[in-house]
Design a protein with these regions (language model features):
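Active-site acidic/histidine proton-transfer and metal-coordination neighborhood
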Residues: 65-66, 82-177
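N-terminal pre-domain/capping segments
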Residues: 1-98
Length: 177
């Protein structure tokens, strides 16, 4: 077990206006920005798609490692684990795989995501679909060589969204690794 496995970390999810105000311009500057604030974690935002290349991510990872900063990745917001459309659920698995690739390049191991809405189905039916999609995602990660990655569903605040504490705990229970 290394230090990253147990150390409590504090960081931000993305950058604020202060990033540019302090003179930072590129995502390559994120480790310096994070360290300047005295933080040791950073959640890289891929909310609108995974657009960070692995080469650039590798450079960011090297700088972050020297500063004791650990990255995680927030997967795209358009994940829909419980969609009535099978293709959208399969797309959600693909988005998680893309996120895993960039997360690995950043030296991270946690992929944060929102599970999506219930749509026009009961919460119970939506949760069953989401649990199935989560199982598929875990299997896909393992098959693609990302078995060390942890999927981290977030709670959601709106009534129509899947993501109460109990629903998130059920999703987390899928991954037995």
């Amino acid at each position: 077990m290394n230090e990253c496995d147990w150390k409590i970390r504090f960081g931000t999810a993305g950058t604020s206006d202060s990033f540019e105000a302090k003179g930072y311009k590129s995502s390559l500057d994120i480790p310096a920005y994070t360290a300047e604030m005295g933080l040791n974690a950073f959640e890289y935002q891929c909310g609108h798609g995974v657009r960070l290349g692995v080469d650039k991510a590798g450079k960011m990872a090297a700088d972050a490692a020297e500063r004791g900063i650990l990255f995680s990745v927030h997967a795209p917001y358009y994940i829909s684990m419980s969609s009535l459309e099978e293709e959208k659920r399969l797309g959600s698995v693909r988005y998680l795989l893309q996120s895993a690739e960039v997360c690995r390049a950043l030296g991270g191991r946690r992929i944060i995501f929102h599970s999506g809405s219930c749509g026009k189905q009961s919460r119970e039916a939506a949760l069953e679909k989401a649990l199935d999609t989560m199982r598929r995602a875990v299997e896909a990660l393992d098959e693609a060589g990302y078995g060390d990655m942890t999927l981290c569903p977030e709670t959601m605040g709106k009534i129509g969204q899947l993501g109460t504490l109990d629903e998130v705990l059920a999703l987390c229970g899928v991954d037995k690794r």
